[in-house]
């Protein structure tokens, strides 16, 4: 074998070695990636089960409070404790329970009371007053209320000041009205006339529950939600009076709606219209769980509703997100 042939043979050996190294590196990288994906999947599954376990504990806690106080729900009960944190083997669970009846149910906007004959349903009047209490001009508040009513009703006929498909299809890109109950509060951003600033102001006061009922629990409304309490009544109840009423509330709240309506600040207003939409007892709660495992965060939001003597899940939303390393 001459020098030229030996050189070619050596070159081929080197090429084969290089190819083997590339393949080995690729296989190692692929194996590491598959291992990481498997580990992440297992972590996510474990986090989900942690959240479901915490959900079961939340339901049991609500059940115990309901048995202890079947006719009242208030902020001195165990469920209302904030900042719950549980340590598990490889992470932490953060849990919060809030009253789903301490907000305005947007899906109740078209509901009417048993004896109500007004042209505009009382919940729609409440929503209009809430918008005004949050700084909206009266005309804009009326337009947004009508737009929401059109969005959740099942017809294509616009109300006075309302908006149906033709209004939204004229936008770019165009879209159609829901013509069904809201699935999430974020749908408000799609309403004609809604902007980001007003939407952010509204968020603490509203919810989109799985049914169309409205029963605002005056025992669990925080003083900083006085705008909603004032909106439940005609304009005679001011924001200042509503806030003072909530601040003066006993730790265990009012024993009945009648006891609440007997407060001096409410004697100057028409309480009969608001009465059907008030409560001192809640049967629906929102439990929010955050499971922290390394850099991963697993979020779950469960709507729990009283079903007989226990609480069951009627809606559950969950997701996973990652936090970048510092």
UniProtKB/Swiss-Prot annotation:
UniProt KW Cell inner membrane keyword: yes
Record's keyword annotation contains Magnesium: no
Any Gene Ontology biological process: protein secretion
Swiss-Prot/TrEMBL keywords: Cell inner membrane, Cell membrane, Membrane, Protein transport, Transmembrane, Transmembrane helix, Transport
GO CC terms in record: plasma membrane
Domain of life: Bacteria
Pfam families xrefs: T2SSK, T2SSK_1st
Propeptide section residues: 1-7
Membrane-side (Periplasmic) residue stretches: 29-326
Transmembrane portions of the chain: 8-28
Subcellular location: Cell inner membrane
Modification comment: Cleaved by prepilin peptidase.
UniProt-listed InterPro entries: GspK, GspK_central_sf, Pilin-like, T2SSK_SAM-like_1st, T2SSK_SAM-like_2nd
Family under the similarity heading: Belongs to the GSP K family.
Function (record text): Component of the type II secretion system required for the energy-dependent secretion of extracellular factors such as proteases and toxins from the periplasm. Plays a role in pseudopilus assembly and seems to control its length. Interacts with the pseudopilus tip complex that is critical for the recognition and binding of secretion substrates.
Subunit annotation: Type II secretion is composed of four main components: the outer membrane complex, the inner membrane complex, the cytoplasmic secretion ATPase and the periplasm-spanning pseudopilus. Interacts with core component PulG.
Name of this chain's protein: Type II secretion system protein K
Organism for this UniProt entry: Klebsiella pneumoniae
Source lineage: Bacteria, Pseudomonadati, Pseudomonadota, Gammaproteobacteria, Enterobacterales
């Amino acid at each position: 074998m001459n020098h030229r042939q030996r050189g070619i043979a050596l070159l081929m050996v080197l090429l084969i070695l290089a190819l083997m190294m590339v393949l080995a590196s690729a296989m190692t990288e692929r194996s590491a990636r598959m291992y990481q994906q498997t580990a992440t999947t297992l972590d996510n599954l474990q986090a989900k089960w942690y959240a479901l376990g915490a959900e079961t504990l939340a339901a049991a806690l609500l059940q115990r409070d309901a048995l202890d106080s079947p006719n009242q729900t208030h902020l001195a009960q165990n469920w209302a404790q904030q900042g719950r944190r549980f340590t598990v083997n490889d992470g932490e669970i953060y849990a919060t329970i809030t009253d789903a009846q301490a907000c305005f149910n947007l899906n109740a906007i078209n509901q009417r009371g048993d004896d109500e004959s007004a042209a505009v349903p009382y919940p729609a009047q409440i929503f209009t007053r809430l918008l005004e209490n949050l700084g909206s001009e009266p005309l804009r508040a009326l337009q947004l209320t009508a737009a929401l009513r059109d969005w959740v009703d099942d017809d294509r006929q616009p109300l006075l000041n309302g908006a149906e498909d033709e209004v939204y299809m004229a936008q770019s890109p165009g879209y159609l009205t829901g013509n069904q109950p809201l699935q999430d509060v974020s749908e408000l951003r799609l309403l004609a006339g809604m902007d980001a600033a007003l939407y952010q102001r509204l968020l603490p006061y509203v919810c989109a529950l799985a049914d169309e009922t409205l029963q605002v629990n005056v025992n669990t409304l925080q003083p900083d939600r006085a705008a909603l309490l004032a909106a439940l009544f005609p304009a005679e109840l001011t924001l200042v009076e509503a806030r003072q009423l909530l601040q003066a509330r006993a730790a265990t709240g009012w024993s009945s709606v009648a006891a609440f309506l007997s407060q001096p600040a409410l004697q100057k207003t028409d309480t009969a219209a608001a009465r059907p939409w008030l409560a001192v007892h809640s049967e629906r709660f929102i439990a929010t769980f955050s499971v922290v495992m390394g850099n991963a965060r697993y979020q779950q939001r469960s709507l729990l509703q009283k079903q007989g003597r226990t609480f069951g899940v009627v809606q559950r939303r969950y997701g996973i997100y990652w936090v970048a390393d510092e």
